[in-house]
Design a protein with these regions (language model features):
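PAS/PAC or PAS-like capping segment
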Residues: 100-101
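Short basic alpha-helical hairpin corresponding to helix-turn-helix/winged-helix-like nucleic-acid-binding
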Residues: 58
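A short, hydrophobic, proline-anchored segment that marks a local hinge/packing element in signaling
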Residues: 79-84
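PAS-family sensory domains
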Residues: 1-55, 107-114, 119-120
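Sensory-domain boundary capping and coupling elements
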Residues: 94-97
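Per-ARNT-Sim (PAS) sensory domains and their PAS-associated C-terminal
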Residues: 61, 66-76, 91
Length: 120
């Protein structure tokens, strides 16, 4: 829950095996998605894109797919990474999602240490 990004891992058989939990997840996840085909976790209109990414990763044609969208007034960055073992065998896909809205609002510079949140 301390990560500034949301992580979801889909295995080589296209099944959701892990997702990070946190109070500010961009896309809500419940434990019910674990073991489910990732295609069943996306709107029907985008399943063909999911299939294309997975096919390209599996075949080694691509390593990263990247999107950014406006969602409920937020600027959301979504990246997919092919995960491979040292021998190059495809193990699955890691989805990394981040709300970049606060970062897009930054201006100027901060060169000195300044904490914005209190210690836990």
């Amino acid at each position: 829950s301390a990560l500034p990004v949301d992580l979801t891992f889909v295995d080589a058989e296209d099944r959701v095996r892990f997702f990070s939990e946190g109070p500010d997840r961009v896309f809500a996840r419940s434990k019910a998605v674990l073991g489910r085909l990732v295609q069943h976790c996306h709107p029907p209109k985008s399943v063909h894109i999911v299939d294309q990414i997975l096919s390209d990763f599996r075949a080694g044609r691509q390593r990263v797919a990247e999107f950014w969208i406006e969602l409920r007034g937020r600027f959301v960055h979504i990246r997919y990474f092919a995960v491979r073992n040292p021998a190059g065998q495809y193990l699955g896909t890691l989805e990394v999602t981040q709300d970049l809205t606060p970062l897009r609002a930054l201006t100027g510079e901060r060169r000195l240490l300044q904490y914005d949140t209190p210690a836990a």
